[in-house]
Amino acid sequence: MAEIKNYTLNFGPQHPAAHGVLRLVLELDGEVIQRADPHIGLLHRATEKLAENKTFIQSVPYMDRLDYVSMMVNEHGYVLAIEKLLGIAVPERAQYIRVLFDEITRVLNHLMWIGAHALDVGAMAVFLYAFREREDLMDVYEAVSGARMHAAYYRPGGVYRDLPDAMPQYKASKIRNEKALAKMNEARSGSVLDFIDDFFTRFPKCIDEYETLLTDNRIWKQRLVGIGVVSPERALQMGLTGPMLRGSGIAWDLRKKQPYEVYDRMDFDVPVGVNGDCYDRYLVRVEEMRQSVRIAKQCIEWLRKNPGPVMTDNHKVAPPSRVGMKTNMEDLIHHFKLFTEGFHVPEGEAYAAVEHPKGEFGIYLVSDGANKPYRLKIRAPGFAHLASLDEMARGHMIADAVTIIGTQDIVFGEIDR
């Protein structure tokens, strides 16, 4: 009798649907996946080790480069861990700004996810729509920090600076006439907060557009319904978090269960799935974008009414004002010490977790009392998700592997670290 031999296929790392540098070794029986073996490490940059040789504040930009689609949320986990060890209080206004930018980042992440996921499955229009909205949010990043992606905006003790009073405007060029320019700058005549408010006022209609294209689309449902099903029990056993866990019907959200900053004052709902398949995870993330709009609106309302400091006044941790440095010798010394030596963190260890767009992003920080971390451990949500890929893909077709990678919302910056 003829021997049945499985076929081995290398999927990636040069594959457009591999989301970066994923290499999957697929064992196939015809076109059915028997085993999926993810090979990682192609984007390993030793972030945890590099952080041990940098002062606490110098490692903030490294956080942006972990999950390079959800920049500020990575920073948030890191600064929370430092603040726990230092035992410092963050001004209320800074907390609201952080929550606002966490939600802006969540929308940025989910727009990238819905665009890339739809493109992988074969729907191109959504990708173009999503990037149209992302552009506005990238401009907000740029307005507050000077960078479109790697913002380094959060600081231990607060944020780098308050929201600017003026939103940068588009300038005239050869490709834009005055009419087009006026339309583009329509929402940019006020402050950054006005621009964010305007964006979140019109954004729900944009979400409706994506849903019109996908939610009841017959082809979209055929590609997602019943694919990559994870039961609630298995989701917990495999360490899934975020939309991957909520898609399986478990209402676990750190913003509700272990509130940090001012999330306990926010009024929002936690969407959960029923069937635990790719379609439910899609619905959960779309609803998350709608909830982010609610949270952002509440933050904007509070920020308008309550001006105030956005950085702690402890000059051992935060730089003094430039005005003070010109007249006060002590301020100048503090500034010099802070940017040469950094600040010393008391001996101890702390774990801080935030509800990252992809799941639970945790930072475990060990300090030996020096000006650098003794050990920094990053708990990346995508790592556990990728580990579950084999189980989710078994028995499905090769084309479904693409759908499953898309639904996991994998970014290799955080997985390989």
Curated annotation (Swiss-Prot):
Supply the source organism for this entry: Burkholderia multivorans (strain ATCC 17616 / 249)
**Gene3D superfamilies assigned:** Cytochrome-c3 Hydrogenase, chain B (1.10.645.10)
Q: Kindly state one GO CC term assigned in the UniProt record.
A: plasma membrane
Q: Per the similarity annotation, which family is this?
A: Belongs to the complex I 49 kDa subunit family.
Which gene holds the coding sequence for this protein?
nuoD
Please give the function described in this protein's UniProt entry: NDH-1 shuttles electrons from NADH, via FMN and iron-sulfur (Fe-S) centers, to quinones in the respiratory chain. The immediate electron acceptor for the enzyme in this species is believed to be ubiquinone. Couples the redox reaction to proton translocation (for every two electrons transferred, four hydrogen ions are translocated across the cytoplasmic membrane), and thus conserves the redox energy in a proton gradient.
Q: Where in the cell is it found?
A: Cell inner membrane
Q: Keywords assigned by UniProt?
A: Cell inner membrane, Cell membrane, Membrane, NAD, Quinone, Translocase, Transport, Ubiquinone
Q: What is its EC number?
A: 7.1.1.-
User: What name appears for this protein in its UniProt entry?
Assistant: NADH-quinone oxidoreductase subunit D
UniProt catalytic activity: a quinone + NADH + 5 H(+)(in) = a quinol + NAD(+) + 4 H(+)(out)
| InterPro entries in UniProt | NADH_Q_OxRdtase_suD, NADH_UbQ_OxRdtase_49kDa_CS, NDH1_su_D/H, NiFe-Hase_large
The cross-references to SUPFAM superfamilies, in alphabetical order and at most eight, read:
HydB/Nqo4-like
| Entries under NCBIfam families matching the protein | NuoD, PRK06075.1
Query: What topology does the record note for this protein and the membrane?
Result: Peripheral membrane protein
Identify the PANTHER family for this entry.
NADH DEHYDROGENASE [UBIQUINONE] IRON-SULFUR PROTEIN 2, MITOCHONDRIAL (PTHR11993:SF10), NADH-UBIQUINONE OXIDOREDUCTASE 49 KDA SUBUNIT (PTHR11993)
- Which residue ranges run through the membrane? none
Subunit organization: NDH-1 is composed of 14 different subunits. Subunits NuoB, C, D, E, F, and G constitute the peripheral sector of the complex.
- Show the coiled coil region(s): none
Q: Which domain of life is it from?
A: Bacteria
* Molecular-function GO term, any one: NAD binding
